Amino acid sequence: MTDTARQSFPGNMPNAYQPGKGNLPPEDEALVARRQKALGPAYRLFYETPVHLVRGEGVWLYDKDGKAYLDTYNNVASVGHCHPHVVAATARQAAVFASHTRYLHDTVLDYAEALLAHFPSDLSHLMMTCTGSEANDLAYRIACAHTGGTGFIVTDNAYHGVTHTIAGMSPSLGTGVALGEHVRL
């Protein structure tokens, strides 16, 4: 991507919200102001006029006026938003023990063994992460260790996450986040 192309939209994110340019009602403008005050600049809003979502159910997201949007983008494509089994399992486990994997605990091993049972035998270990950023960072580290290489090819508007290494592979974060030295568009 040329420098001119990178500068053609805010933060290199096409269709991004630009403060003062969207057609937002006052209550949404107030939410934008709160976001700008409380959240870091990497938390960009999608769309020239951001959608004010209030809930999700299955494949649908709903805005404050009740309008439904088919979610083909967000982070829960495999089970949908607020799947009752996931909500119940999360509540059940949170009521018992909610911590990381650095302690002995049966549940994390039960889950790991059940998941690994679905994989070929040469995929015999797993590493759990909390976010896609962490998962992509780990995948990059594994790829580098396995191949000895460091190169990474991305598309112009790619988003892979916000860890230090992975942000450098995410041109959509904008010109304020330099691309990594081994990244090629």
Can you name each region flagged by the protein language model?
Residues 114-185:
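PLP-dependent aspartate aminotransferase-fold enzymes
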Residues 3-57, 75:
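Active-site-adjacent loop/helix segments that line or gate small-molecule/cofactor pockets in enzymes
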Residues 53, 79, 167-169:
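Short clusters of hydrophobic/aromatic residues that line enzyme substrate/ligand-binding pockets
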Residues 24, 28, 54, 58, ...:
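Generic structural signal for well-ordered, non-membrane alpha-helical segments
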Residues 62-63:
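Hydrophobic alpha-helical segments, especially N-terminal targeting/anchoring helices
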Residues 33, 69, 74-105, 110-128:
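Glycine-rich phosphate-binding segment of PLP-dependent enzymes
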